[in-house]
Amino acid sequence: MSYLKFDKTLMTNLEEALPREILRTNRSGAYHCTTIVDCNTRKYHGLLVIPVPELDDENHVLLSSLDETVIQHGAEFNLGLHNQGDNYSPRGHKYIREFECEKVPTTIYRVGGVILKKEKLFVHHENRILIRYTLLDAHSATTLRLRPFLAFRSVREYTHENAQ
């Protein structure tokens, strides 16, 4: 039995879910830090944050997040969640059914007849994160589209949208 397991009720309530953060590290100095609903709310949050000693003495966010979109019958369901001021979009947390954080952080999503499992694991001595998706159930042909948000910025800096 897992003591770090959260169900749909908590995961769909942002007031309860956003203050709960997860931090995973490896032996090379890299880390993954975000909220349990995968919404980066702090400037040091990121899916892959690593030290870059050739550049400076700071950690750098290389991969901010990885947005998943489930596509079925031409309909798209974005599983991502981003914070833009007081607005949260695209609100993919509503598809989370369960989150467990034992040895491997695991999130279960349900979108209609699709049940998708996501697991995140660090490689011990490398600046690398592995993400495995398992399609547990689907009643029809299903496509999973992945969209990485690359940052390559210091954890001390924010990046802003270009004005163009």
Predicted region positions:
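Terminal accessory carbohydrate-recognition/targeting modules of carbohydrate-active enzymes
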Residues: 1-164
